[in-house]
Amino acid sequence: MIRLDKEYSGRRLLDIDHPESPFGTKESPAVVQSYFDKRNIGCRGGEGEDGHDVVWFWLDKGKSFECPVCSQYFEHGPPDGHGDDEDHHH
């Protein structure tokens, strides 16, 4: 058994958080934040019996995606505090 001291001390492995949000619908999609124009996403469906094997897909800036298994909708969005109108670099 491999001991992951960081995990036991309460820190997440590699400090990677897995975003969790309400089930995305066409009217209210799950917004996936990213600094990049394209991001790889995995959909696991809903909770419990509504879950499914992970479906991987690319989510492009300005486009939405509907999971072909559970019909959950996803939308690409900027990280908090970084709007699309902020196209300047320091």
From Swiss-Prot:
Biological-process GO terms, alphabetical: mitochondrial electron transport, cytochrome c to oxygen
GO MF term set: metal ion binding
Organism of this sequence: Arabidopsis thaliana (Mouse-ear cress)
GO cellular component labels: mitochondrial envelope; respiratory chain complex IV
Keywords: Metal-binding, Zinc
UniProt: Zn(2+) binding residues: C43, C67, C70
PROSITE patterns: COX5B_2
Record's keyword annotation contains Transmembrane helix: no
Family: Belongs to the cytochrome c oxidase subunit 5B (TC 3.D.4.11) family.
Protein name from the UniProt record: Putative cytochrome c oxidase subunit 5b-like
A Pfam family hit: COX5B
Keyword rRNA processing applies: no
Lineage of the organism: Eukaryota, Viridiplantae, Streptophyta, Embryophyta, Tracheophyta
